[in-house]
């Protein structure tokens, strides 16, 4: 078992990582091969379009590394579904867009591997909460039952 030196978490554009900051400094300070990571990451995420991809890079004592890509952030997927550039300036006071419950379910299905639940309904409620906190209205959501 190799000794772990560092675990670096970054959010990078799919297929477009470069050795420039934030990648270079984050990996360089731990002695990992930056170009090797950039090539491997870009190859692994080339088919994901223009999404932002969270990645967790584990760097070992022998300067080798492994990385795990996660699903794009909920906020990115919600903005994409609502066709927005960014969330509300004053969430709760202003609504900047709306998404349907069906879109929420689609996002929840996509995010399932990274969420701490196996229940699609619970995952959808998490996504709906994220949407509301961004000032995006969720249309057609079922009534919430008190637990």
Curated annotation (Swiss-Prot):
Domain of life of the organism encoding this protein: Bacteria
Keywords: Methylation, Ribonucleoprotein, Ribosomal protein, RNA-binding, rRNA-binding
UniProt cross-references to SMART domains, sorted A to Z: RL11
Signal peptide bounds: none
Assembly behavior: Part of the ribosomal stalk of the 50S ribosomal subunit. Interacts with L10 and the large rRNA to form the base of the stalk. L10 forms an elongated spine to which L12 dimers bind in a sequential fashion forming a multimeric L10(L12)X complex.
Protein name: Large ribosomal subunit protein uL11
An individual GO BP term: translation
InterPro entries the UniProt entry points to: Ribosomal_uL11 (IPR000911), Ribosomal_uL11_bac-typ (IPR006519), Ribosomal_uL11_C (IPR020783), Ribosomal_uL11_C_sf (IPR036769), Ribosomal_uL11_CS (IPR020785), Ribosomal_uL11_N (IPR020784), Ribosomal_uL11_N_sf (IPR036796)
GO CC term (a single one): cytosolic large ribosomal subunit
Annotated function: Forms part of the ribosomal stalk which helps the ribosome interact with GTP-bound translation factors.
Signal recorded as keyword: no
NCBIfam families: L11_bact
């Amino acid at each position: 078992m190799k000794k772990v030196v560092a675990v670096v978490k970054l959010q990078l554009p799919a297929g477009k990582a470069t050795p420039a900051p934030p990648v270079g400094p984050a990996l360089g300070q731990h002695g990992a091969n930056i170009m090797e990571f950039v090539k491997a990451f870009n190859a692994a995420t080339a088919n994901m379009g223009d999404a932002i991809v969270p990645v967790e890079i584990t760097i070992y004592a022998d300067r080798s590394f492994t990385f795990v890509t996660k699903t794009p952030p909920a906020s990115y997927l919600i903005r994409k579904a609502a066709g927005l550039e960014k969330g509300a300036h004053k969430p709760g006071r202003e609504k900047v867009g709306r998404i349907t419950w069906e879109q929420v379910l689609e996002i929840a299905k996509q995010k399932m591997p990274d969420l701490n639940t196996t229940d699609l309904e619970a995952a959808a409620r998490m996504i709906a909460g994220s949407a509301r906190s961004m000032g995006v209205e969720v249309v057609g959501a079922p009534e919430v039952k008190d637990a």
